[in-house]
Curated annotation (Swiss-Prot):
Compartments where found: Cytoplasm
Protein name: Sulfur carrier protein TusA
Pathway: tRNA modification
Organism: Edwardsiella ictaluri (strain 93-146)
Keywords: Cytoplasm, tRNA processing
Main location: cytoplasm
Length: 82
């Protein structure tokens, strides 16, 4: 079995941060990425289980995977093209 979270282009550690900080950091990080690059987000704020998927939909990025059964939560985002 392949670990989808292995080898992302960038990693963002949002542990200990609370809403809205994790999403603000994701937005800032993604802004400096090239379309198609991947970002691993590691967070422990329960609000990210709603906020990260919503951010991806709104900003037209792809949420490739999420692991939210236990903390730390992990999300793998692929930057959309624009």
């Amino acid at each position: 079995m392949t670990d989808l979270f292995a080898n992302p282009d960038k990693t963002l550690d949002a542990l200990g941060l609370r809403c809205p900080e994790p999403v603000m950091m994701v937005r800032k990080t993604v802004r400096h990425m090239v379309a198609g690059e991947t970002l691993l987000i590691i967070a422990d704020d329960p609000a990210t289980t709603r906020d990260i998927p919503g951010f991806c939909r709104f900003m037209e990025h792809t949420l490739l995977a999420q692991e939210i059964e236990q903390t730390p939560y992990r999300y793998l985002l692929r930057k959309g093209g624009a």
